[in-house]
Curated annotation (Swiss-Prot):
In MsbA the ATP-binding domain (NBD) and the transmembrane domain (TMD) are fused. Residues 378-611 form the ABC transporter domain. It is found in: Cell inner membrane. This is ATP-dependent lipid A-core flippase. Homodimer. ATP binds at residues 410-417. Residues 33-344 form the ABC transmembrane type-1 domain. SMART domains: AAA. The keyword Nucleotide-binding applies. Belongs to the ABC transporter superfamily. Lipid exporter (TC 3.A.1.106) family. Keywords: ATP-binding, Cell inner membrane, Cell membrane, Lipid transport, Membrane, Nucleotide-binding, Translocase, Transmembrane, Transmembrane helix, Transport. The lineage of its organism: Bacteria, Pseudomonadati, Pseudomonadota, Betaproteobacteria, Neisseriales. It comes from the Bacteria. Its EC number is 7.5.2.6.
Length: 621
């Protein structure tokens, strides 16, 4: 099918992804059929306007003619011939032609305009709706992807897939479909007119079609990899812009404006270079196609003049032929130039389908416990992030009782955060198993598993919405009284009172209107409202001043009441009251016990505590 539509320029394998996306168009097939009918109207009126010239010159300036003698023979062809003769006489043969001919011309142009508007509107409508559906499915797919995918894939690439490539694949498809159908119909109609007027001259016109097809194929092959590289470069640019925007404080603090500008300039130059190649090919394509068309036109004029001198054609037929041929030039040029946007469309469709085919997060669990008690056990758990054999956790074993507060301490890279990320299955173990209340977490449905946890981390993320909506995110059915209670428990009553909007004050992008301590306490309020049986704290009090830390610590104490808690600590002074402290190094447990027990051993924990005390002394000095 695609070979026929593109005159052999593209093959089935080139359009496999694109044809898959066309499944999104099927619900709108009635509108597409209506658009096709309108496109046919455009092609028919365009063709007839060319044929209009011959009778205008041959009959328009002559005296009124006698009524035609109609055939008495039966049959469809005779009937159609009689209708044509009567219509020609009504328009061109009577003395009323001084107003019927202009009126007929106006009617033709109006019909063409209505058909052109209808086809453009319907195809644009289908394009917009299709893009909306594809983006909806892509966003739904993004929500199913694993945390590892989001960590390893730049945000600019995801944005390019969802915005740029979707637009390129579907919008280009709408334009290309319109060009292919409308201009093919126009060329076909005008070719019929040419054959009707002079079949010998028409053969010369037809001979240029294969030459234009070969020219388009040459530029398609030349630009395939250039267009692909250009799309990838745009994704890289999106990522550079996103990183610079998100990290604007780091850029300013370290005077990294020049470095950021250099990164942007490098990728921008790459895009410019690739765009120049595409533009050069596109610009060179038009003159070559024009040269082929002009040679054909020159030959036609030469032969037509010779035929006219020898009485084989009338002036009206010659003028109509030239007009029809000139009218054919624009659609032929559009068809000849379509290979480049079509190549872009196919490559964009490949990118969209590749994203839609990304494997979702594994969820093979079948169990759906409503609320667990909070007993946790790790059995011989290994975690390998990389393929070089280095393990983040190595034979990790740990049992946590219901309601127990367990703190994980150790140097950076010892595996503390990995333990926390394993429980909601943000990370999958390479070996071993993890159980909650004796149930392997791999056997629990992901949504039910994650409903058992509340997470407060050092990397707080807040939405660009109101305070109320950010807290209620953990429980969308919560009312204002419940949200207010959670905020009060998180020591945020003063924040509510400080704004006339109270609970409904906007907090800015990622809580940019709040202080660090306030952002942390909003995250705690969100966790309090969720009321999950297991609490995960990943360095929740790091990088806070003393007063903010005190308020956050008070909120955390309220949050951890009657819950199993796993606390990743950087400041060891914050976990002295933990029921048990687990000391880790190189993915293994090397010490465990209460604060007093570990200090009495004068081991690794004592060393970490001494280092922490020195750091605290430096901060307060």
């Amino acid at each position: 099918m695609i070979e026929k539509l593109t005159f052999g320029l593209f093959k089935k394998e080139d359009a496999r992804s694109f044809m898959r996306l066309m499944a999104y168009v099927r619900p709108y097939k009635i509108r597409i059929v209506a658009a096709l009918i309108a496109i046919f109207g455009v092609a028919a009126t365009e063709s007839y306007l060319a044929a209009f010239i011959a009778p205008l010159i041959n009959h328009g300036f002559s005296a009124p003619a006698a009524p035609p003698e109609l055939s008495a023979a039966a049959g469809i062809l005779s009937t159609l011939q009689n209708w044509r003769e009567q219509f020609t006489y009504m328009v061109w043969g009577t003395e009323n032609k001084i107003w019927t001919v202009p009126l007929f011309l106006i009617i033709l142009v109006v019909i063409r305009g209505i058909c052109r508007f209808t086809s453009t509107y319907l195809m644009t409508w289908v394009s917009v709706m299709t893009i909306s559906k594809i983006r909806k499915d892509m966003f739904a797919k993004m929500l199913t992807l694993s945390s590892r995918y989001h960590q390893e894939t730049p945000s600019g690439t995801v944005l390019m897939n969802m915005l740029n490539l979707t637009e390129q694949s579907v919008s280009n498809a709408s334009d290309i479909f319109t060009v292919l159908t409308r201009d093919t119909m126009i060329v076909t109609g005008l070719t019929i007119v040419l054959l009707y007027l002079n079949w010998q001259l028409s053969l010369i016109v037809v001979l240029m079609f294969p030459l234009l097809s070969l020219l388009s194929r040459y530029y398609r092959d030349r630009l395939k990899h250039v267009i692909s590289d250009s799309q990838k470069s745009i994704g890289t640019m999106n990522n550079v812009i996103a990183e610079t925007h998100q990290g604007h404080r780091v850029v300013k603090l370290f005077n990294g404006q020049a470095q950021a500008a250099n990164r942007f300039d490098a990728i921008n130059r790459t895009i410019v270079r690739l765009s120049k190649k595409i533009t050069q090919a596109t610009a060179a394509h038009s003159p070559f196609s024009e040269l082929i068309a002009s040679i054909a036109l020159a030959v036609v004029i030469f032969i037509a003049l010779w035929q006219s001198q020898n009485g084989y054609t009338t002036i009206g037929e010659f003028m109509a032929f030239i007009v029809a041929m000139l009218q054919m030039y624009a659609p032929i040029k559009s068809l000849a130039n379509i290979s480049i946007p079509m190549q872009t469309m196919f490559l964009a469709a490949d990118g969209v389908c590749a994203f839609l085919d990304t494997p979702p997060e594994q969820d093979k669990g079948t169990l759906a416990p409503q609320r667990v008690e909070g007993r946790i056990s790790f059995r011989n758990v290994d975690v390998e992030y990389r393929s070089d054999g280095i393990k983040a956790l190595d034979g990790f074993n740990l049992d946590i009782r219901q309601g127990e507060r367990v703190a994980l301490v150790g140097r950076s890279g010892s595996g503390k955060s990995t333990v926390v990320n394993l429980l909601p299955r943000f990370v999958e173990p390479s070996a071993g198993n993890i159980c909650i209340d004796g149930i392997d977490i791999a056997d629990i449905k992901l949504d039910c598993l994650r409903a058992q946890f509340a997470l407060v981390s050092q990397d707080v993320f807040l939405f660009d919405d109101t305070l109320f909506e950010n807290v209620r995110y953990s429980r969308p059915d919560a009312g204002e009284a419940e949200v207010l209670s959670a905020l009060q428990a998180a020591n945020l009553q003063s924040l509510i009172d400080a704004s006339p909007l109270g609970l409904h004050q906007p907090i800015g992008s990622n809580g940019s209107n709040l202080s660090g301590g306030q952002r942390q306490r909003v995250a705690i309020a969100r966790a309090i409202l969720k009321d999950a049986p297991i609490l995960l704290l990943d360095e929740a009090t790091s990088a806070l001043d003393n007063e903010s830390e005190r308020l956050v610590q008070q909120a955390l104490e309220r949050l951890m009441e009657n819950r199993t808690g796993i606390i990743v600590a950087h400041r060891l002074t914050t976990i002295e009251g933990a029921d048990r402290i687990i000391v880790m190094d190189d993915g293994k447990i090397i010490e465990q016990g209460t604060h007093e027990q570990l200090m009495s051993q004068n081991g690794y924990y004592t060393m970490l505590r001494n280092i922490s005390n020195k750091d605290a002394a430096v901060r307060t000095a």
